[in-house]
């Protein structure tokens, strides 16, 4: 099980926006950061996208929901949209 931890200082949304060079349409990327325990000595800091209007996850411990994983075009397991489940 991959454990994700969000600290109080990470309960915020970072937004980046611009205009797509290909389509000319405006876009906004909403991200939150957290730490994930990959089994090493220290957890790794990572960013994950939030949906438009989605509130940031509160501080706490989580695990990746199984729906976060998908099979890509090459038949390999990959992480898609990150969905977190609270660990109690």
UniProtKB/Swiss-Prot annotation:
It holds the Pfam family Phage_DNA_bind. The keyword Thylakoid does not apply. InterPro entries: NA-bd_OB-fold, Phage_M13_G5P_DNA-bd. The keyword DNA-binding applies. One of its GO terms (biological process) is DNA replication. One of its GO terms (molecular function) is single-stranded DNA binding. Keywords: DNA replication, DNA-binding. Homodimer. Belongs to the inovirus G5P protein family. Binds to DNA in a highly cooperative manner without pronounced sequence specificity. During synthesis of the single-stranded (progeny) viral DNA, prevents the conversion into the double-stranded replicative form. G5P is displaced by the capsid protein G8P during phage assembly on the inner bacterial membrane. This is DNA-Binding protein G5P. It comes from Salmonella phage IKe (Bacteriophage IKe). The lineage of its organism: Viruses, Monodnaviria, Loebvirae, Hofneiviricota, Faserviricetes. The gene is V.
């Amino acid at each position: 099980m991959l454990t994700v931890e969000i600290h109080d200082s990470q309960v915020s949304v970072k937004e980046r926006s611009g205009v797509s060079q290909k389509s000319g349409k405006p876009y906004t990327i909403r991200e939150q950061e957290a730490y994930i325990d990959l089994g090493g000595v220290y957890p790794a800091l990572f960013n994950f996208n939030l949906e438009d209007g989605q509130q940031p996850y509160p501080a706490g411990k989580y695990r990746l929901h199984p729906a976060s994983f998908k099979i890509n075009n090459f038949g390999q397991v990959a992480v898609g949209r990150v969905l977190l489940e609270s660990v109690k």
